[in-house]
C-alpha cells in the first residue's frame, strides 16, 4: 500500500513540473562530529571551524555563477534543499547571510518547498529557527538516526535521545 501511494504521489508531483523547473541543492559539508557510517564529504566542526568562513565565501561565488546560468537558461527554481553535512552547524548569522545570498541571486517566488536539514539537536536553536522562518524555510528535516543512546554513542554522535526530545519541544 505504501509503495503504491508513494508511486502515485511521485507521478502526480512530476506531472506538475515543467521542463524548465529545477530543484536547487546547497551542500554544507560540516557536522558537529563525523558519524562512523557517513560516506559524505564532510568535516567535523571541531577540527575545521576555520574552514567555514572561506567555504561560505566560495559558496557565495558558486551561487552567483549558478544563478547566472539558471537565469540565462530561463529556468525556474521550484524547491530549495540545504543539506550536508549539517547546515545548522552554521551560526544564525551565517545562515541568515547564506539565505540572503540565495534570495538575492535566485528568483525564489515559485518555490514550493524550502528545506533545511537540522539533524543534530546540538545545532538547533530558537535564533536559527527564527532566521530560517524569516527566509521562507517551510520544512526542517530533523533526523536523529536513532533514539538509542547506546547506538548514538557507537556511531559517534555526542547527543542523547533526551537531547533530541528537548530540541523538538
Question: What residue ranges belong to the model's regions?
Answer:
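N-terminal [4Fe-4S]-dependent radical SAM core
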Residues: 1-24, 73
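Structural motif
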Residues: 21-23, 35, 113
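Hydrophobic secondary-structure block in the mid-to-C-terminal portion of proteins
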Residues: 21-23, 30, 46-50
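Residues at the beta-strand->loop junction immediately N-terminal to the Walker
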Residues: 25-27, 83-84
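Local cysteine-cluster metal-coordination motifs and their immediate loop/turn environment
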Residues: 27-42
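Conserved non-cysteine loop/helix-boundary elements of the Radical SAM core domain that shape
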Residues: 42-169
Amino acid at each position: 500500500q505504501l509503495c503504491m501511494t508513494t508511486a502515485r504521489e511521485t507521478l502526480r508531483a512530476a506531472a506538475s513540473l515543467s521542463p524548465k523547473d529545477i530543484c536547487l541543492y546547497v551542500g554544507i559539508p560540516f557536522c558537529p562530529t563525523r558519524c562512523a557510517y557517513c560516506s559524505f564529504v564532510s568535516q567535523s566542526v571541531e577540527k575545521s571551524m576555520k574552514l567555514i568562513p572561506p567555504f561560505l565565501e566560495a559558496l557565495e561565488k558558486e551561487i552567483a555563477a549558478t544563478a547566472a546560468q539558471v537565469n540565462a537558461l530561463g529556468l525556474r527554481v521550484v524547491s530549495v534543499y540545504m543539506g550536508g553535512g549539517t547546515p545548522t552547524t552554521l551560526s544564525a548569522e551565517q545562515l541568515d547571510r547564506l539565505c540572503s545570498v540565495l534570495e538575492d541571486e535566485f528568483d525564489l517566488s515559485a518555490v514550493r518547498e524550502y528545506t533545511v536539514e537540522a539533524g543534530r539537536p546540538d545545532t538547533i536553536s530558537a535564533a536559527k529557527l527564527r532566521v530560517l522562518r524569516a527566509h521562507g524555510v517551510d520544512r526542517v528535516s530533523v533526523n536523529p538516526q536513532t533514539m538509542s543512546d547506546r547506538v548514538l554513542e557507537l556511531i559517534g554522535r555526542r547527543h542523547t535521545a533526551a537531547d533530541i526530545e528537548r530540541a523538538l519541544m
